[in-house]
Amino acid sequence: MSAHEPHTSLVRPAAKAWHARLELGFERQPGGRTALAHRRHVGPLRVQRALYPEGDAICHAVIVHPPGGVAGGDRLEIDVRLDAGTHAVLTTPGATKWYKSNGLDARQRIDIDVGAHAKLDWLPQNNLFFDAAHASLEFVLALGDGASVLGWDATQLGRQAAGEAWSAGSIASFSKIVGPSGRPLWVERARLDAGDPLRAAPQGLGGFAVYGTLWALGAACTEALAESIAPALPFDDALRAGVTCVAPGTLLIRALAHSMEALQRLLAEQWLALRPIVHGVDPKPLRLWQT
């Protein structure tokens, strides 16, 4: 899992902007198999074939974006539906690169519906924002009765491997997690500009260029669980993390780092530790991460 990218400057003309949409639907078949029963794509978003490294009950799939990056004017939409009793593990093969803007914002919307007693592991690789990238990101997740979810998002500002800082640009983000009754469990709206003083402020990013959030959702996600996790989380000059139970059944781990590798290791470790507790299944590292 690496955020290292070669030094390139890519600005695609607005006339060639991609508008892409991917729909995925999982259903429970006789015998308890989770099947990828619906897939539909428009434009350059795809899903690789379903895999079952953990047996028929858990369907693994990899979402791919062949262009490799997102430029100004691009619009990506991902719609995922899990029927009752299914279990899906979704990831991506590499970082999503957000290129220098051509004067237009790049946009992404992710909409996920997790049915009753369904389980989801949402494990994308990180977002990597090039200098002068302008992006708008929206993420909405709805939970059915008895559903559980483990997922994360991770962001890197600037291409560290190329010696590039994120000195210009903006990121507008909106995240919402909704419970079975339709009541919001967690809502966050933010706008980060490259010149924002909060990037250096201790109550903001504290000078870190890498940050991420892991969310754990389900009946097992209690204040007591958060308190049991907190003592082992790092808090030093290289990596800082904390955990909060923001609502019954809703636990967040948030972290800041100077390198994406350190953040990804932390997120993966916490996901593996939480999986037996939240989903009731064995911890199993993704094969994709081992290639």
From Swiss-Prot:
Sorted UniProt keywords: Chaperone, Cytoplasm, Nickel insertion
Lineage top rank: taxon: Bacteria
Annotated GO CC locations: cytoplasm
Coiled coil: none
Predominant subcellular localization, coarse grouping: cytoplasm
Location(s) in or outside the cell: Cytoplasm
GO molecular function, one term: nickel cation binding
InterPro entries: UreD
Function: Required for maturation of urease via the functional incorporation of the urease nickel metallocenter.
Subunit structure: UreD, UreF and UreG form a complex that acts as a GTP-hydrolysis-dependent molecular chaperone, activating the urease apoprotein by helping to assemble the nickel containing metallocenter of UreC. The UreE protein probably delivers the nickel.
Family per similarity comment: Belongs to the UreD family.
The protein's name in its UniProt record: Urease accessory protein UreD
Organism expressing this protein natively: Burkholderia mallei (strain ATCC 23344)
